[in-house]
């Protein structure tokens, strides 16, 4: 191919590649074409280099490459011994656990749904029932006594909301009213100089009037535990309770008496088996009881020693459990066994504690530790433990049939600190209290459902405060708990904190653990707040019980603080008449009132009224505070508040029901009182009050349009100057007055300037001489009168600039503006 043919082919190819689009052609140089060729060549050689080398290598060795490729594709990388499909391991225990939990959850969920549906149905049933009763009551109220008035209405008589004999509204229920009546009677006795036992009184009322055995039992145990010789109010109840063995003896005696009652009832229920006989006594009762309870060989298995054909130690134990040491000693004497134990029992019964008794206790403890710890007779072990006060951690499971048995056993092995033996482990009163309150607690005794039981356990262990606080948590028992606390405090057996601001139940660092102190003030105040507005008389009787507690805010005792707070919250005429008595219109004094019946020497009703007035004054309720100051005879404080109120509203026009209008009645009462008791008030206060009342009259005349009378009042009292010559005199007079007068001075100057300006306008619009309230000798014609008015206006502006008080900018602007308008 020559060069011409090659050129023709190139042109033909060029023509074929040309398109109709107007895309510009790309021209490359030879160097660019060479570079692009190298790039394409490098890409092709890199992609195929590895495969080509592999083919060359294997082909030279005689390997059939296509077959090799097929074999490689058929190979699998997985191990032949593993299954192709993954199989998870079977965990039977986890599967069963999961199924069991799912079943439990499904049951719980189903139960919840059924309970919710049941509650929902019950709720709507009750709602529909209440709606039906309301509709019947409304229809019954609409339908009159004559059926002829509504012939088409069918009705039946149902109980209406109103009683046949309406009674006064009260927040107290029947039980609370009974308690409140007894509190009022008790307070009256205290006022008359008598001091009855409130706890015994309330216990008898509950027994006779309340149809609740659990509440009566709680009062009975509290009454029994406090049936001790009275103690002085100066002795701390907590320390006395912890150091005196009488409380432990009382608790044990209570449990022993209750057990004797149980034994009698048990024997009466089994008279055929009991075979009672002989003289009625604990000795024969125990014999009958043991004869019924321990029948058959199985019941007698493991018991030691026999007396008259019956086991000995059950008789001794139940005699001690019944509180009769004589019967226990008689059984031991009849059997002739354990003479040392009989001697110890006799010494313990007689109250002797000498060297012989200490020696016997040591010998018997050695015998117990060496031989009786492994004894199979639980009654014998219990007798030794009770008489020797040892082995406090042994549970005596065979004999503990109730919490009473457990408590009696623990109380029987208690030893005071002065009787403790360092060589043996013994139980103390504080240890038993901690065991009941802290170790076992409410959950162990199921206190939510068995509140009476838990209360009795705490009371029998001397923890009155914790027991009452527990009862006070529930609405059902709160009323009983509060009155139990009141009754204990009245006989000086309730431990109260040092500060009335403490929580309801608190601990004192000086008290032995776990003893608590109950804040009686907080308990009573929370209780009375519910009804103090509707049953004020009853609330005051409860507050009277707090007269011996000191208030933290420095307002005397807590009773005064509570009554003061009550009056501050509700200080209407009815409340004032109830507490302070009826007002005598002649002299303004109040006579009667329930507060006077309490005869509080530290603070009479006048001091109480002053205290309430001070509190109302702090809260900004000045009108009520003034009324209380009137009752308390505090004219000075009443005048100060009246001055403060007058300074705020004296410039306002009079309107019915406004503060300014009500101040008029107060001013009339103050004027009448100042005639008699003006010497009791500071002179400065009286002067300020007098000036403000004059200013009040000035503004009354000003708003009524009596301009002449208004200016005469100010001129006569030298409050504003009549001319420029009197400015200094008026400023000096203002300085001697109280801040209340200075506060109202801008309004006085504005009103006075307005009066002068109105007179100026009237004078300029008239051809007559000046108004009649200017001196006719000075105002013979219009010009002197105008000059006099301008001079007076100038005096007002000068006075506003001279007083030692920063006038409002609007006042100065208005004064200058009116003065300029008069030129």
Curated annotation (Swiss-Prot):
Subunit structure: Part of the nuclear pore complex (NPC). Interacts with msk (via C-terminus); this association might be facilitated by Nup75. Interacts with Mad (preferentially when phosphorylated). Interacts with Nup154 (via N-terminus). Interacts with the Polycomb group (PcG) proteins Pc and E(z).
One GO MF term attached to the UniProt entry: chromatin binding
One GO term of the biological process aspect: protein localization to nuclear inner membrane
Pfam family, one: Nic96
Lineage: Eukaryota, Metazoa, Ecdysozoa, Arthropoda, Hexapoda
Function: Required for nuclear pore complex assembly, maintenance and function. Required for nuclear import of phosphorylated Mad via importin msk. Has no role in classical nuclear localization signal (cNLS)-dependent nuclear import via importin-beta. Mediates the association between the nuclear pore complex and a subclass of silenced regions bound by Polycomb group (PcG) proteins, enables long-range interactions between Polycomb loci and contributes to repression of polycomb targets.
Family in the record: Belongs to the nucleoporin interacting component (NIC) family.
PANTHER family, A to Z: NUCLEAR PORE COMPLEX PROTEIN NUP93, NUCLEAR PORE COMPLEX PROTEIN NUP93 NUCLEOPORIN NUP93 DEAD EYE PROTEIN
SS bonds (residue pairs): none
Protein name per Swiss-Prot or TrEMBL: Nuclear pore complex protein Nup93-1
Disruption phenotype: RNAi-mediated knockdown in oocytes and nurse cells results in irregular distribution of chromatin to the nuclear periphery, leading to disrupted karyosome morphology. RNAi-mediated knockdown in the wing disk results in de-repression of genes silenced by the Polycomb group proteins complexes such Abd-B.
Keywords annotated in UniProt: Chromatin regulator, Membrane, mRNA transport, Nuclear pore complex, Nucleus, Protein transport, Translocation, Transport
Subcellular location: Nucleus membrane; Nucleus, Nuclear pore complex; Nucleus, Nucleoplasm
Coiled-coil zones: none
Any one annotated GO CC term: nucleoplasm
InterPro entries xref list: Nucleoporin_int_Nup93/Nic96
């Amino acid at each position: 191919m020559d060069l011409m043919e090659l050129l023709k082919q190139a042109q033909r190819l060029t023509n074929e590649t040309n398109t109709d689009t107007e895309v510009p052609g790309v021209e490359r140089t030879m160097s660019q074409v060479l570079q692009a060729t190298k790039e394409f060549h490098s890409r092709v050689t890199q992609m195929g280099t590895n495969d080509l080398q592999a083919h060359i290598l294997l082909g030279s060795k005689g390997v059939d490459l296509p077959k090799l490729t097929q074999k490689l594709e058929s190979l699998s990388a997985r191990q032949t011994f593993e299954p192709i499909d993954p199989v998870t391991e079977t965990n039977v225990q986890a599967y069963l656990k999961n199924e069991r939990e799912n079943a439990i959850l499904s049951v719980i969920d189903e139960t919840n749904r059924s309970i919710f549906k049941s509650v929902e149905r019950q709720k709507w049933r009750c709602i529909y029932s209440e709606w039906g009763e309301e509709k019947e009551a409304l229809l019954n109220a609409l339908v009159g006594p004559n059926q002829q008035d509504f012939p088409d209405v069918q009705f039946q008589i149902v109980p209406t909301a109103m009683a046949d004999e309406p009674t006064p509204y009260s927040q107290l229920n029947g039980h609370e009213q009974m308690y409140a009546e007894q509190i009022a009677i008790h307070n009256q006795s205290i006022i008359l100089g008598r001091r009855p036992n409130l706890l015994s009184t309330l216990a008898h009322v509950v027994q006779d009037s309340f149809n609740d055995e659990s509440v009566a039992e709680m009062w009975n145990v509290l009454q029994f535990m406090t049936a001790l010789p009275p103690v002085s109010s100066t002795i701390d109840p907590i320390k006395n309770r912890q150091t005196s063995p009488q409380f432990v003896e009382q608790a044990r005696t209570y449990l022993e008496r209750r057990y004797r009652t149980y034994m009698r009832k048990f024997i009466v229920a089994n008279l055929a088996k009991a075979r009672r006989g002989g003289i009625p006594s604990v000795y024969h009762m125990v014999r009958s009881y043991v004869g019924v309870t321990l029948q058959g060989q199985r019941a007698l298995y493991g018991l030691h020693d026999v007396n008259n054909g019956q086991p000995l130690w059950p008789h001794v134990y139940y005699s001690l459990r019944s509180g009769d040491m004589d019967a226990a000693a008689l059984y031991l004497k009849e059997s002739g066994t354990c003479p040392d134990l009989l001697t110890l029992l006799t010494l313990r019964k007689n109250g002797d504690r000498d060297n012989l008794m200490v020696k016997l206790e040591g010998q018997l403890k050695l015998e117990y530790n060496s031989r009786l710890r492994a004894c199979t007779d639980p009654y014998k072990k219990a007798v030794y433990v009770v008489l020797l006060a040892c082995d406090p951690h042994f549970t005596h499971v065979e004999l503990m049939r109730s919490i009473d048995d457990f408590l009696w056993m623990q109380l029987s092995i208690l030893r005071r600190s002065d009787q403790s033996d360092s060589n043996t482990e013994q139980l103390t009163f504080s240890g038993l209290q901690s065991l009941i309150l802290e170790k076992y607690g409410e959950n162990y005794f199921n206190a939510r459902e068995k509140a009476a039981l838990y209360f009795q356990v705490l009371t029998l262990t001397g923890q009155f405060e914790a027991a009452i606080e527990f009862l006070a948590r529930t609405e059902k028992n709160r009323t009983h708990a509060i009155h139990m606390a009141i009754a204990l405090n009245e006989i000086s057996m309730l431990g109260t904190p040092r500060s009335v601001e403490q929580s309801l139940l608190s601990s004192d660092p000086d008290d032995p653990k776990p003893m608590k102190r109950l804040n009686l003030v907080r308990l009573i105040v929370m209780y009375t707040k519910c009804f103090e507005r509707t049953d004020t008389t009853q609330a005051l009787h409860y507050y009277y019980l707090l007269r011996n507690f000191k208030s933290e805010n420095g307002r005397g005792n807590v009773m005064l603080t509570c009554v003061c707070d009550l009056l501050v919250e509700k200080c209407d005429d009815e409340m004032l008449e109830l507490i302070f008595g009826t007002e005598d219109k002649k002299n303004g004094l109040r006579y009667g009132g329930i507060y006077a019946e309490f005869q509080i020497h530290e603070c009479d009703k006048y001091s109480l009224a002053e205290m309430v007035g001070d509190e109302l004054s702090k809260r900004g309720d000045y009108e009520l505070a003034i009324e209380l100051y009137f009752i308390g005879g505090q004219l000075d404080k009443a005048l100060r508040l009246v001055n403060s109120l007058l300074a705020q509203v004296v410039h306002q026009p009079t309107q019915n029901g406004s503060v300014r209008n009500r101040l008029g009645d107060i001013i009339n009462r103050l004027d009448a009182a100042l005639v008699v008791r003006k010497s009791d008030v500071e002179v400065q206060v009286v002067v300020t009050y007098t000036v403000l009342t004059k200013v009040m009259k000035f503004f009354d005349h000003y708003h009524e349009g009596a301009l002449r009378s208004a200016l005469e009042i100010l001129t006569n009292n030298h409050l504003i100057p009549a001319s420029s010559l009197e400015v200094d005199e008026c400023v000096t007079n203002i300085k001697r007055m109280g801040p209340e007068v200075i506060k109202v001075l801008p309004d006085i100057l504005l009103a006075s300037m307005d009066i002068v300006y109105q007179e100026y306008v009237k004078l300029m619009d008239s051809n007559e001489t000046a108004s009649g309230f200017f001196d006719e000798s000075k105002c013979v014609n219009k010009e002197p009168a105008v000059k006099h008015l301008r001079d007076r206006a100038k005096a007002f502006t000068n006075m506003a600039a001279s007083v030692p008080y920063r006038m409002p900018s609007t006042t100065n602007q208005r004064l200058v503006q009116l003065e300029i308008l008069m030129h």
